[in-house]
Every structure is written in structure tokens, then in C-alpha cells.
A protein has these predicted regions:
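Helix-loop-helix hairpin linking two adjacent transmembrane segments in secondary transporters
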Residues: 15-60
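Cytoplasmic helix-loop-helix junction between adjacent transmembrane helices
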Residues: 1-16
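C-terminal transmembrane bundle of multi-pass solute transporters/carriers
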Residues: 47, 51, 55, 83, ...
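Juxtamembrane intracellular "pre-TM" segments in multi-pass secondary transporters
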Residues: 66-100
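Coil-to-alpha-helix initiation sites in intrinsically disordered, low-complexity, charged segments
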Residues: 7, 11, 73-81, 214
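Recurrent gating helices in multi-pass secondary carriers
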Residues: 94, 102, 106-114, 197, ...
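Glycine/proline-centered helix-kink
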Residues: 15-30, 114, 146, 230-238
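Residue-level signature of transmembrane alpha-helical cores of multipass secondary-active transporters
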Residues: 11, 18, 23-27, 101-106, ...
């Protein structure tokens, strides 16, 4: 319960920042640019503030004191630790399957974040304000999804939930690509935020429950490192969007996420059998 609630709270805070951050940045730029659309001072100031916030965040972590219960007594090189983590992932069908299912959304599901400005301009004929509202809709849906996850710690068949929300995420992206009405697009993208928050947070929560305590930090590092594969999905989807249309690019990414999630879910019975997140 504590892990699920912690992941839900972390996701809710992150998505709340997605709503507040762009609005605050736009407000700062508007004030210091003084209506000059060619001014770079306001944008530069936003990056300075962002850097300071990162610094404050890093310093704050240094003051967290928690002795924990370390289980590793030998000092080894970082390379050997990483090799052991990769062997653990390969040898565990459940952990490897969860990491694979977490990679697919980063390859295809998050393409909507990259293509959203072009979709808002080319398809919805919207301006910066419309794009901001679409992003707010996604963030608001993600917050609701995070809060919903906090109530799902006792839900059974979590493996099916992870696979199902991943497939639904892809289906919603495909549906979003066919919309041309601003209100409908906002509603659909809100559902995308809702489903994506549940999928990513539940996957990571279940993964932590499946991994041995001595390996937890290294496995989470492998999981985070795998998210760096996102450009591999954005490049072909962006090429499709450029050579055909934004709608076709989004439709392709949505269908790819839907079908690949269902395919790998069908090929990984151990993941489907995950019940309460415990072995």
C-alpha cells in the first residue's frame, strides 16, 4: 500500500508541475518580454529560474537522512553492478517483461507530447493558448489518474491492468489523431493523461514489489536508462508526420503501441499472472 501511495503521490506532484510550470513560465515571459516577441530575456530568465530550482532540489535531497537496511556488504565497481542488474533482468521474466512494457509507451505513447504543437497548429488551427489548454487537459487527467492509482493498491490482476492500460493508451492516441474538434481533442487527451499516469506508475510500483531489495536500486536504474530509448521511437514517427501528416504520425504511433502491447502481453504469461504485485 505504501509503495502504491508513494508512487501515486509522486506522479500527482509531477503532473501538477506540468500544469503550473508552463503557465508560470508563460507569465514570466509575458512580463519581462514586454510584448516584444523577439525578446529572449524572458525565456532566458525562465531557464535561470529552472536551473536554480534544480539546484534547490538537489541540495534538499542531501538533507534526507534514512539509514535503511543495506544488504550489500561488498564493494564492487559500477560496471559489475550494472552487469549483475542486466543479468537479473534477463533471468527474471516478470521484471524483464515489466521493463519491456514500460519501454513501449516511451517509444510510441509519448510521441503525442512531441507532435502536439504541430497538431494544435495544423489540425486544430489553434494558437499558443490552445496548445496550453491541451497540455493542461493532459496534466489534469494525469493527476486524476495518479489519485485513482492510490485507491488501486488492493486491486487484483495488476498484470492485466498494466497490459490493458498500455493498450488503451495506444488506442486513445489513435483516436486523438482522428479528432478535428478542439473540445473533443481536449477530452480525449485528458483521458490519455489519465490512462498513462495509471500505466506508468502501476508498472513501476509493481516492479519494485517484484525485485529483491538488494537489487531494487540497480533495477530502477536500468528502467530509467531504458527510457532514454524514447528518441528511437520519435524519429520514425516524426519522419512519418513530416512526409505525410501529423495525424498519420500519431495514428501510426497509437496503433503500434496498441498492437505491440497486446502482442508482448500475450507472449508474457508471467506478467499477466501478476496479482497483487507479489510473487
Amino acid at each position: 500500500d505504501l509503495i502504491f501511495n508513494a508512487m501515486a503521490f509522486n506522479s500527482a506532484c509531477w503532473n501538477l508541475a506540468r500544469i503550473i510550470g508552463p503557465a508560470a513560465a508563460g507569465f514570466i515571459i509575458a512580463i519581462f518580454a514586454g510584448g516584444n516577441t523577439t525578446s529572449s530575456f524572458g525565456v532566458g530568465l525562465v531557464y535561470v529560474i529552472l536551473s536554480l530550482l534544480y539546484f534547490v532540489s538537489a541540495v534538499s535531497v542531501l538533507f534526507i537522512v534514512h539509514p535503511g537496511r543495506p544488504t550489500q556488504t561488498q564493494k564492487r565497481s559500477a560496471l559489475k553492478d550494472m552487469q549483475e542488474a542486466l543479468r537479473y533482468v534477463v533471468s527474471s521474466p516478470i521484471v524483464g517483461g515489466l521493463i519491456l512494457l514500460s519501454i513501449l509507451p516511451f517509444l510510441f505513447g509519448l510521441s503525442i507530447n512531441t507532435l502536439l504543437p504541430a497538431f494544435s497548429t495544423d489540425v486544430l488551427n489553434g494558437g499558443p493558448e490552445d496548445l496550453g489548454l491541451l497540455m493542461t487537459g493532459m496534466g489534469f487527467g494525469a493527476i486524476l489518474g495518479s489519485l485513482t492509482l492510490a485507491k488501486m493498491s488492493s486491486v487484483t490482476k495488476k498484470g492485466f491492468w498494466i497490459i490493458g492500460t498500455g493498450a488503451l493508451w495506444g488506442g486513445l492516441v489513435a483516436i486523438f489523431s482522428t479528432t478535428s474538434d478542439y473540445l473533443i481533442s481536449t477530452i480525449v487527451i485528458g483521458f490519455i493523461g489519465f490512462v498513462s499516469a495509471i500505466n506508468m506508475s502501476m508498472n513501476r510500483s509493481v516492479m519494485q514489489l517484484q525485485v529483491a531489495q538488494s537489487m531494487r536500486g540497480r533495477i530502477m536504474s536500468v528502467d530509467m536508462m531504458s527510457h532514454g530509448l524514447m528518441p528511437l521511437g520519435i524519429l520514425p514517427i516524426g519522419h512519418i508526420a513530416e512526409t505525410t501528416s501529423v495525424q498519420t504520425g500519431l495514428l501510426t504511433s497509437g496503433i503500434a503501441l496498441l498492437l505491440l502491447t497486446l502482442l508482448f502481453g500475450a507472449l508474457m504469461p508471467q506478467v499477466r499472472k501478476i496479482n497483487l504485485g507479489y510473487k
